[in-house]
Amino acid sequence: MKSAEIREAFLGFFEEQGHTRVASSSLIPGNDPTLLFTNAGMNQFKDCFLGQEKRAYTRAVTSQKCVRAGGKHNDLENVGYTARHHTFFEMLGNFSFGDYFKRDAITYAWTFLTSEKWLNLPKEKLWVTVYATDDEAYDIWTKEIGVPAERMVRIGDNKGAPYASDNFWTMGDTGPCGPCSEIFFDHGPEIWGGPPGSPEEDGDRYIEIWNNVFMQFNRTADGVLHPLPAPSVDTGMGLERVSAVLQHVHSNYEIDLFQSLLAASAKAIGCSNDNQASLKVVADHIRSCGFLIADGVLPSNEGRGYVLRRIIRRACRHGNKLGAKGSFFYQIVAALVAEMGSAFPELVQQQSHIERVLKGEEEQFAKTLEQGLKILEQDLADLKGTVVPGEVVFKLYDTYGFPMDLTGDIARERNLTLDEAGFEREMDAQRVRARSASSFGMDYNSLVKVDVATQFTGYSATTGSASVVALYKEGQSVTHLNEGEEGVVILDTTPFYAESGGQIGDSGFLHAGDVRFDVSDTTKTGGAFLHHGVVASGSLSVGAQVETQVADEVRDATKLNHSATHLLHAALRQVLGEHVQQKGSLVDSQRLRFDFSHFEAIKPEQLRALEDIVNAEIRKNTEVMTEETDIDTAKKKGAMALFGEKYGDSVRVLSMGGEFSVELCGGIHASRTGDIALFKIVSEGGVAAGVRRIEAVTGAAALAWLNAAEDQLKEAATLVKGNRDNLLDKLTAVLERNRLLEKQLEQLQAKAASAAGDDLSAAALDVKGVKVLATRLDGQDGKALLALVDQLKNKLGRAVILLGSVHEDKVVLVAGVTKDLTGQLKAGDLMKQAAAAVGGKGGGRPDMAQGGGVDAGALDSALALAVPFVEQGI
């Protein structure tokens, strides 16, 4: 059976057993901030198992895409060198949420694996493990299924603590947990290894193919297990592993799915398709990279983006080892889409985007790879011992973008290891240097503990009556706040919008008679709305009745900007592509800021198109529609959800322009798109690798911005004695005149340098037959010094030259060595010494190098290094 047929058979079998087929969730976990990537089928059902979420079904079956690279679960360094390690894999799984339990789960697994209708695996080839004290599972396997005792293995607490076992699953130190039962396939005596639980269990003869987890306990902080009222089942079977078994091959890389990717990789690289570890690395990595990019991850220097960058660069390095010329990795995407696109349509939809991102990252890495490899080669040549120092690993990471595991790959090929502890020390030191001093206000959101949920009335009102439920001062609960005191007020009902989804919290005031509390911000913790501010007059007590008043003008301007972000988001996806995802936003009364995923700067014509599209929707003046519905219905209508946000059973769908923009949003918005009046982008730029930011203004603020721009144009025209109509012509003339003057200046400087060169050459010293000239020429820039060094090399013949200058309060250095000496003396080495002496850095070619620093007082000492440099080198 082909891998695709096995996947479909698994899903179909469990559908016949009353399971709902659920699509794979994103590789970016939406309900677990502690998890870097989705790495198991149960991740998307975590809240179901915890009893925090109810779904319309109690039985589910999935084929879940998973990534294990980075974080706790990291297979990266083993990929390509073993038969079964991958960065990306598919986990087939069936799940029961308080429905069936051990007997049915075991029966389903055995039936699917061994019946002629399904996989038809030989029963005598299957071994089973259970937790040592799980007699129930053991009896089901032996007495009902009929597995002989000699192929049953009880596994106890083999990890040094109670319930710490390969056959006991826990979600954490506390919470749902339970025993598990694993099914192993015996590849036969020709493969070395022993059955599970034996001293030889790490061999490859017995391979785990399916794990059934029985969640039947809740573990409390004291370590005691309490039975769950509704036990559940979580199972997982690796598609690649079971495919290898059914296709009668020992390595996952020999299955049909990988054969097409290996062939495509070999073709793109231009190498033979044989059993090469580097080719396996490339074929594996195209899967994880393709799926991660399709799910919205872009290469960057932190978090998930950094893991993606590491994987891409590792693939590129292994491709280069095999002889790849130029960019090749992106060319394999088409084969990935052909192999897996029918099961995962997001690959088809995002193919061109994946290719663009990979090609861009390859080209960027190529610029630094060659230089970094040369540096590493030099460091390894000087290495004493078998451990690459942490400082070297960090230098390659920090300067050349070499992930530590890429350096580790190169070291492994030479039987070297890395000083990982030293690398981490360097990283820690960098973090300390980078950490800016900052102070934070009182974090009431983590301190306030109120069971009462505030009722929000702000969608339809900006005023109202309310009762004070609680008061806080300096993080402590109090019964009253006096005049002049800052604190937090919690009401039973409020029209104040709490900061969420990028929209700032409302401001305004509360009042009752002569008591007034000025609200500067509103936030939310749990169900409670926190009104932050100060008592302007009187004394406010718990239980008091107050009138609420939101600052209307600020609210109105803010909601226009919020609605504009929705229109901008839709326009971005229309102009740039469906890969655009919101990465963050800030909406206040002055402007809007919108961060989104994109891999390159936006072109001017694209910015103009965005403005045109948004303003066209504004001019249509369509009604902004809101609807309360369930999450599944909202998604079927095409509503976009903000990634990372948690949504309840009921969600609010906001639509503009009919189907132009449909998003889940709980914010305050305009009544009609025409209320926004005008939309103008004021800036666009990058904030991180793969993340762009647009800032824009709307309404009155947009008009004010345009008026200011008009005033600047008039002022510029006045400066060049022109007007708006001929401003460009006037500026062009000024720039042309400036260019001619700069050219004349360069010619004069060249003549002066030539004259200086004649004078300087006479000052050169003879050191062991080498003319050494080291002098300072203050006021000269680097360009002038470079030209002078070239001239002096021609005049002096066999020479070493070091020139320095203090130019615009900085030290400029240029070193030159004539070609006949570069075998013994290198300009780059001299420059490193000289630049370090003035508190800077430098380097370059053996015959020419540049550098600089900040310590002008040390320039003479730096220049004095030239003579001993020659004396020691000759």
UniProtKB/Swiss-Prot annotation:
PROSITE patterns: AA_TRNA_LIGASE_II_ALA. Zn(2+) binds at residues 562, 566, 665, 669. GO terms for cellular component: cytosol. Its cofactor is Zn(2+). InterPro entries: aa-tRNA-synth_II/BPL/LPL, Ala-tRNA-lgiase_IIc, Ala-tRNA-ligase_IIc_anticod-bd, Ala-tRNA-synth_IIc_core, Ala-tRNA-synth_IIc_N, Ala-tRNA_ligase, Ala_tRNA_ligase_euk/bac, DHHA1_dom. It is found in: Cytoplasm. It catalyses: tRNA(Ala) + L-alanine + ATP = L-alanyl-tRNA(Ala) + AMP + diphosphate. It is an enzyme of class 6 (ligase). Gene3D superfamilies: 2.40.30.130, 3.10.310.40, 3.30.54.20, 6.10.250.550, Bira Bifunctional Protein, Domain 2, Threonyl-trna Synthetase, Chain A, domain 2. The keyword Lyase does not apply. This is Alanine--tRNA ligase.
